[in-house]
């Protein structure tokens, strides 16, 4: 699915190649762990270029929509001119750094689980972009069942942060808990489930934070399984 922040980063990067503008504000997203559905960016540019910028955005909308091949039927890019006005905007360097970071930072699924090829192993999401009085905050959700892969994604974000002359802060963490192909307790639990309920259980991995990861981090020789409820609706 298309992340609105990443799409906006691409649009701004493309526009910056042909037009001079400064960002006034950039905002969007509701939660760090939810793929952003919208991004609203306000820029200030030469009024004489307003129509050309709007036309360029229309062209980018057509290009990006065709790339999704119908998977994002409601994707829409709109450029609205507010006329001549005086606004406080980012300087040229900050504008370039925000665009470069938003467009260049890694996002989405990074790799799948080798034991379960259809299950995501490592991913991250550009969830919230927020402009305050003198700061742009970009919030990510970073997840992996492999601790070293988690570190690798964070290192890449750190690099992008350094290149943008920005700072970063980690708040909250989901310890990794990898699939154990040699688990002793799992086959026993499967057999017990069949005895109790007369059917095969569904055995799968989940791409999310579980308390098991915290326990495993404290004692990594544990053999752990987790049970989840049946969810409907």
Residue ranges and their predicted role:
Residues 32-40, 93, 178-191, 214-218:
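Short glycine/threonine-rich loop-to-helix capping motif typified by GTGT followed
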Residues 136-154:
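C-terminal catalytic subdomain
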Residues 114, 121-123, 127-134, 141, ...:
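Zn-dependent metallopeptidase/amidohydrolase metal-coordination segment
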Residues 11-14, 56, 60, 156-160, ...:
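Generic, well-ordered alpha-helical scaffold segments in large soluble proteins
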